[in-house]
A protein has these predicted regions:
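Helix-adjacent hinge/juxtasegments
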Residues: 61-84
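Hydrophobic ligand-binding cavity/cleft-lining segments
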Residues: 1-64
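Structured beta-strand/loop patches that form or line metal/cofactor-binding pockets in enzymes
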Residues: 88-90
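Beta-strand/loop substructures that line and gate deep hydrophobic ligand-binding cavities in soluble
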Residues: 51, 76, 81, 92-149
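A conserved amphipathic terminal alpha-helix motif
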Residues: 136-178
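Short, exposed beta-strand/loop patches in secreted or surface proteins that constitute
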Residues: 39-43, 82, 110
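A short, hydrophobic/aromatic-rich structural module that often spans a beta strand
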Residues: 1-7, 13, 97-112, 169-178
Length: 178
């Protein structure tokens, strides 16, 4: 499944890029499906910034329902490489369930657009049914389709909500500064 999402934010590219890169944990209040984002590591090397974040989903899942769901179904790890000179980030998402079966990777381009920033997110989500362990062979293809459809339906709205969150965050910061 190909991922192709665009978002426009009416702020300058350097500010938008830095907000996505440096303020991710502060954007949680703007994302209804995320409970927490935790920075696990940050390393600069050869002009690139390598970040690892753990995402904790399920914010809109009632606590009672969460008690019956595995936390692994709601959480994931994102590894990203930020290239400041090109205003890009390459990302790789590792699910905590069916980790070997799920391949989700892509790249975001932050482009100057009029007086704002156009973010183009391109990637792919692939589920390999042969890597789904512990289920009867007949079910693995169906499980792969369900997982791919579920994740595929979550990625675009989460990206759009995060972009809207960046916009709200920057407007709030602008109001405080004025």
């Amino acid at each position: 499944m190909l991922i192709s999402i665009n978002a426009y934010i009416p702020f300058a590219r350097p500010l938008v890029y830095a907000t996505y890169r440096d303020k991710l944990t502060e954007l949680v209040p703007y994302m209804s499906k995320v409970r927490q984002i935790q920075l696990k590591s940050s390393q600069k090397q050869d002009g690139l910034l390598y970040l690892v974040h753990d995402w904790y989903g399920g914010a809109n899942v009632p606590a009672l329902a969460r008690a019956f769901l595995s936390e692994d179904l709601l959480n994931w790890t994102e590894e990203s490489i930020w290239n400041n000179s090109e205003y890009t980030t390459s990302w790789h998402i590792k699910t905590h369930v069916f980790t070997e079966a799920v391949h989700c990777t892509g790249k975001n381009h932050f482009l100057e657009d009029d007086k704002g920033t156009l973010i183009q997110s391109r990637g792919e989500l692939i589920i390999d049914p042969q890597q789904i362990k512990g289920t009867p062979q007949q079910l693995t293809v169906a499980i792969a389709r369900i997982v791919e459809n579920s994740l595929g339906k979550q990625i675009p709205p989460n990206f759009q909500q995060m972009s809207q969150g960046v916009c709200h965050y920057l407007k709030k910061e602008q109001e405080i500064a004025n």
